[in-house]
Amino acid sequence: MKTVFDEDFNLQNSDYDFNYQKALTGRLDNFEGDFNQELVNEIVLWKVNRYAEVDSATIKLVNQIDRNSVNIDEQLTREVIRQLLETNGVQFAMASTFLRYRNPNIYQIIDQRVYRIIYPKRIFKPSYTKSFSNISKQIDLYINYLTDLRKVCDQLEITFNLADRILYEADRRVNKNERLLNYGTSQ
């Protein structure tokens, strides 16, 4: 590994071009007010490279989901998920989280824990490629997941709007010795 102490080390002009999360970096660099929780959250997201700048059209689309509905509008759902997944910084589990907080009676978070506890011997490992076909596969997976999750809720007699939380905790308890992907050693 090279360091600044190596004889052949030198800086190049390109080293001065810091393009990491350019819009957020600029906003943070120019912030002159007092720290507050919103600023702390932005700094944390900047550092872990998880800041998602969702455009106003996508936010407007998310807001078209009826907060009080108990029935899924599949066409709108597909459109919303596609827009979210095409946004830099938004991956599959995060997109489902946005939907869950918009209407938990229709949507629940899809993640490794809940997925593995309802699908024996299957691993939740979505591709992060933003191609049209890959996003379509993820949307189909999510729609099927919601259907299957409803069946599990009926079987276990739990309310759907709390299913992701209940099953997350159940997985932590019953699979506490099983590692998750990207957390320590992979399965």
Region annotations inferred by a language model:
Residues T77-V80, M94, Y145:
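N-terminal alpha-helical segment
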Residues A95-R100:
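Short hydrophobic alpha-helical segments that form membrane-spanning helices or hydrophobic packing faces
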Residues N30-Q83:
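Alpha-helical ds-nucleic-acid-binding substructure associated with the helix-hairpin-helix region
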